[in-house]
């Protein structure tokens, strides 16, 4: 999905949130960090990614469109926090104490590492596997690891090894 397919109102709301949180951080930190580049090119099940070297935030347009309010409230500050931590502290753990501090104390947003958005529309192919108690859907990546003999997956409920159907 290209940026042009995202309604302009959603793009504007994303920019408002980004600028609001950046201004808040600059004020609290006594700095003048620049506005990062923003693109809507993230694919797959990730809501967004922060690219440190290029100082860029990439957002998933499908998840943004399907979860606009929560996405703008949580994901935009989450990715901005990664860039601000990198500028402020240098290279540290991605969701470490510095990031948590930046999220909660500086940006005033709960520090959650993962989103809870429905992923059905962005999931690619899955492969059916079975155990004693249920059927599981493995991602392409996990399926390929099983095929290459690089991984064995077990059911979290019964503990049995998953077998392709």
From Swiss-Prot:
Native source organism of the sequence: Shigella flexneri
Lineage, uppermost ranks: Bacteria, Pseudomonadati, Pseudomonadota, Gammaproteobacteria, Enterobacterales
Disulfide bonds: none
Active site: 79
Family: Belongs to the SprT family.
PROSITE patterns given in the database record: ZINC_PROTEASE
PANTHER family named in the record: PROTEIN SPRT (PTHR38773:SF1)
Obligatory cofactor(s): Zn(2+)
Gene Ontology CC: one annotated term: cytoplasm
Subcellular location: Cytoplasm
Residues reported to bind Zn(2+): 78, 82
Keywords: Cytoplasm, Metal-binding, Zinc
Encoding gene per record: sprT
Pfam families, A to Z: SprT-like, Zn_ribbon_SprT
GO BP terms in the entry: response to stress
Note on how the cofactor is bound: Binds 1 zinc ion.
Residue ranges occupied by any SprT-like domain in the UniProt entry: 20-163
The protein, known as: Protein SprT
Gene Ontology molecular function: any one: zinc ion binding
UniProt-listed InterPro entries: SprT-like_domain, SprT_Zn_ribbon, Uncharacterised_SprT
HAMAP family linked: SprT
